[in-house]
């Protein structure tokens, strides 16, 4: 039986994370006294509602079987400031994605060694920064980002961008801020 304040299996979910506040010895119970739990379900539901609102406003129909990836570079808590939603529609010798930026959101500076990508602004507003030059994209505008080119983007009111590129490889995003590169839990 659990001891007082001990977390149990009922406290665990893929939408929860535990963090120790003190050292926990072998066979010691994980309790509210030596750790804390963060529940992410409500935040993830809020993000999903925000994304659905933008998709509805843009009148875009997505395939029913598509999975939404939440890219949260500095953690879910800072997602509304730094992050992006990614829907991968095709990833073969070529790749097609829809990238959704929420209002006020920044996608931090990065570059790719293997892939070249082109962005088409389909909805909203987007400022793309390429090698320290700001480009305020217009609806329907296409910008190509060559291999090795540092790029970041932001949106004031929210945006949907179609990305067409070479094959997406999970080891081909190199962020200028090393804290992001060291974060193994930046995708949900």
Locate each region found by the language model.
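Double-stranded beta-helix
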Residues: 12, 154-188
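Short acidic-glycine-tyrosine-enriched beta hairpin
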Residues: 132-150
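Conserved short histidine dyad/triad with adjacent acidic residue
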Residues: 97-113
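Extreme N-terminal basic, low-complexity initiation segments
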Residues: 2-9
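A short, N-terminal "cap"/entry segment at the start of jelly-roll beta-barrel domains
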Residues: 12-94, 180, 186-188
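Structured binding elements
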Residues: 119
